[in-house]
From Swiss-Prot:
Signal sequence residues: none
Entries under Gene3D superfamilies matching the protein: DNA ligase/mRNA capping enzyme, Helix hairpin bin, Nucleic acid-binding proteins
SMART domains: LIGANc (SM00532)
Organism of provenance: Escherichia coli O1:K1 / APEC
Record-given protein name: DNA ligase B
Known role: Catalyzes the formation of phosphodiester linkages between 5'-phosphoryl and 3'-hydroxyl groups in double-stranded DNA using NAD as a coenzyme and as the energy source for the reaction.
Gene: ligB
Database matches in SUPFAM superfamilies: DNA ligase/mRNA capping enzyme, catalytic domain, Nucleic acid-binding proteins, RuvA domain 2-like
Pfam families: DNA_ligase_aden, DNA_ligase_OB
Keywords: DNA damage, DNA repair, DNA replication, Ligase, NAD
Family of this protein: Belongs to the NAD-dependent DNA ligase family. LigB subfamily.
EC id: 6.5.1.2
Length: 560
């Protein structure tokens, strides 16, 4: 009873999450968006199944197909499974291909495993499914998966794949096998290399007219032997003896979802002879083959890997002004998971770069993680029917603007506060962008150092700042007064590296104000252009005003 309640709760949670992400479209807009994507996927299907070519990455195709299904559910016009291939095959399968149900996560897999025994895990090899029919010890027929009941006659093609045994003996002499034709790889690490569009490459080779030597780059992984030996160990042994050795090598007994997760993670990082996109867990006990039907396999499930790249919907385009005045563009996304990281924003770059990408709210973009786990845009994979792009702010900012607060300076002013509080500048622990925004909104700072005047009571009464944190912040602000002169100058945005500033031996504001352009050119890593920037900076009226204010606060190095 508890198991069924858990399953019911899971279904309800899934339905709730599905409803929550339905687009806020009018019926007419929904019809247009669904129709456009449906036509594109149909075109990709035709290219893939009729001509053996693919204009889209496998992962992008899968995710956009899932997105289409989601939209159809949202607006009540579900049709057939868009991933079902055209019904061109005329050859009946001796045993139907059932397909495999996908598990959403480890918890769902655990629920499924709880009521079953004698379970085994195999890699979910990424290729194209095939039926191999042996009669009197010889390969009699090879049939593509097709719609699960009928497929194409691939016999002549498969006979040219040297890795597929053409003759067998013993229990396999008169047998029907189901498996995956895959692209042979040497030391393929899924975590690092991804899917490499393996499925489309295999389909292309099998669909191509004429015979090709490149078929020898293919092999087969047998994952089912309908009506074979009852014991999995016997099945694996007989398959290995017949030449299907990979099945025995990559089939392991498992007792629970933790063990499956361990193997799944191992294969995700290991060097394998094929591309995979997850694992399949199957029960050794299977029904008689005459009961096998497409979409009705209850004895096996798949737990796929999180894609290396995810298709994400752009919810909004936002503009940010950095401390130097440069405008950057950020895309807010419908949340996606990448390597256990929830990604909701991705930096596009400059306004020019955004215009080159041509990204608008409603578009679907491919996102992955670059070095140090930073999200990046790989491609725009689908553009919406209605595209309205926001107007970027005027480029009125530079490295000498927004030291003092104003309505037009809001973003650059906040960026300056975030910068001066960072570890490499004044080291104000415990406060980031959200905290600075809360303080500025409540206390209306005049300039970037106004926080030095905040009292413990003011901090304690700031909405968004926990009372337990306010005392810590006040302590941090007071400690900042003891920071060396060079740190304060860096907080003011002097256009120098810390190394160049330290080498200059400037230890007071008055000394720095009297420095010359020639003096700065003599410092390491400081050319004539940078030296001129320093002079412009120290002669700026806002900078001089800040220097005088810090002197009044008796900050070290600024005293008269």
């Amino acid at each position: 009873m508890k198991v069924w309640m858990a399953i019911l709760i899971s279904i309800l949670c899934w339905q709730s999450s599905a409803w929550a992400v339905c687009p806020a479209w009018s019926p007419a807009r929904a019809q247009e968006e669904i129709s456009r994507l449906q036509q594109q996927i149909k075109q990709w299907d035709d290219d893939y199944w009729k001509e053996g070519k693919s204009e889209v990455e496998d992962g992008v195709y899968d995710q956009l197909s899932a997105r289409l299904t989601q939209w159809q559910r949202c607006f009540g016009n579900e049709t057939r499974d868009v991933m079902m291939p055209p019904l061109n095959g005329a050859v009946m399968h001796p045993v139907a291909h059932t397909g495999v149900r996908k598990m959403a996560d480890k918890n769902a897999l655990s629920l499924w495993m709880r009521e079953r025994s004698d379970l085994w895990v195999q890699p979910k090899v990424d290729g194209v499914a095939v039926t191999l029919v042996y009669r009197d010890g010889k390969l009699n027929k090879a049939i593509s998966r097709g719609n699960g009941l009928k497929g194409e006659d691939w016999t002549q093609k498969v006979r040219l794949i040297s890795a597929v045994p053409q003759t067998v003996s013993g229990p396999l002499a008169n047998s029907t096998l189901q498996g995956e034709i895959f692209l042979q790889r040497e030391g393929h690490i899924q975590q690092q290399m991804g899917g490499i569009n393996a499925r489309a490459k295999v389909a292309g080779l099998m669909m191509r007219q004429g015979n090709s030597d490149t078929l020898n780059s293919l092999a087969v992984f047998v994952w089912a032997w309908p009506d074979g030996p009852h014991l999995m160990t016997d099945r694996l042994k007989d398959l290995a003896t017949a030449g299907f050795t990979l099945t025995q090598t990559y089939t392991r007994a498992v007792k629970n979802a933790d063990e499956v997760a361990h193997v799944r993670n191992e294969w995700w990082k290991a060097k394998l002879p094929f591309v995979t996109d997850g694992v399949v867990v199957r029960a050794a006990k299977e029904p008689e083959s005459r009961h096998w039907l497409p979409g009705q396999a209850e004895w096996l499930v798949a737990w796929k890997y999180q894609p290396v790249a995810q298709v994400a919907e752009v919810k909004a385009i936002q503009f940010a002004v950095g401390k130097s005045g440069k405008i950057s563009v950020v895309a807010s996304l419908a949340p996606v998971m990448l390597d256990d990281k929830k990604v909701q924003r991705v930096n596009i770059g400059s306004v020019r770069r955004w215009q080159e990408w041509d990204i608008a709210p409603g578009d679907q973009i491919l996102v992955s993680l670059a070095g140090q786990g930073i999200p990046r845009i790989d491609d725009v994979v689908w553009r919406g029917a209605e595209r309205t792009k926001p107007t970027p702010p005027e480029n009125r900012f530079n490295s000498l603007t927004c030291y003092f607060a104003s309505d037009v300076c809001q973003e650059q002013f906040i960026s300056r506060l975030v910068w001066l509080g960072s570890k490499q500048v004044l080291g104000l622990d415990g406060i980031g962008e959200a905290g600075w925004r809360a303080l500025h909104q409540t206390h209306r700072f005049e300039h970037i150092f106004s926080w030095l005047l905040l009292t413990p009571e003011q901090l304690q009464n700031t909405p968004g700042i926990a009372k337990s944190k306010s005392a810590q912040l006040w302590h941090q602000f007071n400690l900042a007064r003891q920071q060396p002169f060079t740190r304060w100058v860096m907080a003011m945005g002097i256009p120098l590296t810390r190394a160049a500033l330290n080498a200059s031996d400037e230890r007071s504001w008055s000394q720095l104000l009297f420095s010359t352009e020639q003096f700065w050119q003599q410092q390491p890593g400081t050319g004539s252009g940078r030296a001129r920037q320093v002079i412009e900076w120290k002669e700026n009226a806002q900078i001089k005003k800040l220097g005088s204010w810090l002197a009044a606060q008796q900050i070290t190095g600024f005293e008269p």
